[in-house]
Amino acid sequence: NRIAIWGWSFGGFNTLMSNDKVAYQIYPKSFLDTNGDGVGDLKGIISKLNYLKKLGIDIVWLSPVYESPFVDQGYDISDYYKIAEQFGTMDDFDTLVAEMKKRGMHLIMDLVVNHCSDKHEWFQKALADPDGPYAGYFYFREGKDGKAPSNYRSYFGGSAWTKVPGTNKYYLHTFAKEQPDLNWENPVVRKKIYEMINWWFEKGISGFRIDAIINIKKNLDFPSFPADGDDGLVSCDKMLASAHGIGTFLEEMKHETFDKYDAFTVGEVFHLKEDELREFIGEDGHFSTKFDFSAHVLSYGEHGWYDAPALDFNRWRTALFDTQKADLTVGFEANIIENHDEPRGATHYLPAHARNEAGVKMLAATYFLLRGIPFIYQGQEIGMTNCVRNDISEYDDISTKDQYLAALNAGCSKEAALHACYENSRDNARTPMQWDNSLHGGFTTGTPWLAENPNYTKINVTDQLNRPDSVLSFYKELIALRKAPEYVETFTYGTFAAAYEDVDHMFAYYRTNEETGQRILVAGNFGTDTVTLPLEKPADRVLLTNGKTADVILTRNRESASLVLGSCDCVVLLL
């Protein structure tokens, strides 16, 4: 049955041998700079492959390294076939792929094909002749009564339509005006995209993380909708939700590209209904997997993240558990607590009392052993945190600046707006990687493109490599446990069942191997009070703990068939 359900392939090796793998996202600009220009580069990544291998990483997701003006940090691509000069050369990229293969590691790249850069050759030709063939590569529409064709708001604020000077034509951009949306209705565009994808596969990569892919299908009537803000605009999501038939595009792309190379694909997909899961990540789904963003949507208020409510533990736990339950008979999700678009998990998901090494380890264990493929974002493995900034000028991120202005326009004080940025800005995840306690955290000998978090003197790789009780050491143990031969079947294919949901601030669940009967309890106490949990029977073994020794836990457990967890305690028990 498992073979029938999980028979897709992954970068040339069958998924039955790959679902136990661990992935790691690298944001190249902030990983490691080797030439002193303040920007991370491919040679920096190559130099740290042994570090990643020793951590237990099998798959590396590389955020965009293509040629770009970097209006949106590389998600505005001006040439899909070139490496941005600041990252190095194509020879450097080829070396990276080769060195990863030597270590049995796989590289997946970012695929950004909902839009390109306004500096891309296609768009420049479209602007030169808005009625010519290249205009058909994008969405150009006539204005109405001197206004934009419809009232959509882009993700980065302002109208999603920008006027072409000297004409009455507007082009659509669901992101920044420098990121015009590609017209997927045009078969020539699709063909060129597929050719590009296959070109990268021929260079030896194993797959793609697919950016904003739901956006490629538009409602071609581009109707206006009732405004959802004082600006008279409505989120472009409203238009996208009214579009139908995206599956046709996704299946064609899969057939023309991914299937030919047994590729691993992970989709950036939001707001799927439960009855759509199989279409996207089932046995014959559009993608191998997708990220679980159920917790991400809790971080938004009515007008973005500046007015987001404080994270509610019960809502967060319920969101993750609901995803786990929905996936059981369908496929695998990619589990994350951080990425380049999110604040740091150590700050975002942990209450104030748990923002310490014990709390970070607890968060790691409780998410990492869920059913699905775990992704780690650079710096997460050492517990990097959000960074306090004193002025909006210290931020680089385009969406952060938009949300800051939105907060001020809504009547928030400068202090409140900056605090919202501290809590939610994407730049929190983009500060330089903290390698050691030297100047700039060992990231660069120059001036970093984005100022480092000052806590690099206390939170850094070198310090934690030398401490067996560090967060980094705990992640190594966690990865080793998930891959251990005696438990790998349970952690990879075992069922999920929530546990102790009636206990306040308890994040607990069972992973069960239905073939062997092996049953494992994962439990973390996110609250401030000590909690005693009754067990079905005394535990057989403590597989991992972030605090008390295994002997202490088992002694108490065998005396009363119960588990005592203090604040921030987490434990993995073989029952």
Q: Across the structure, where does each feature detected by a protein language model lie?
A:
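Short glycine-enriched nucleophile-adjacent loop
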Residues: 12-16
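Alpha/beta-hydrolase fold nucleophile elbow
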Residues: 2-9
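Active-site and adjacent substrate-binding regions of carbohydrate-active enzymes
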Residues: 17-575
